């Protein structure tokens, strides 16, 4: 029995201007959540000094979290959805389109 799908990803070579500021990261994450048809319950973002962002979106299906290191061009993503497993795949694809990493690695876990 699979109750959900969980993608854990590291994106490398992401442009600094996409991941240094909370406003930009928030905009991208919120757009992905919306376009992937996930049900947002709430969100919290933290801007680090001098740069870098952590954010988490609580969704009815589970959660989306992001951590950025602009100085390394690095984004760590965690996307977990219960129910329709296609939504996690759609969200991940959208993140790749938005962040345009030079490379990435990811792990897909079927939960349950």
Curated annotation (Swiss-Prot):
SUPFAM superfamilies: S-adenosylmethionine decarboxylase
Enzyme class: lyase
GO molecular function: adenosylmethionine decarboxylase activity
Keyword Oxidoreductase annotated: no
Family per similarity comment: Belongs to the prokaryotic AdoMetDC family. Type 1 subfamily.
Subunit (UniProt): Heterotetramer of two alpha and two beta chains arranged as a dimer of alpha/beta heterodimers.
UniProt-recorded name of the protein: S-adenosylmethionine decarboxylase proenzyme
Classification lineage: Archaea, Methanobacteriati, Methanobacteriota, Archaeoglobi, Archaeoglobales
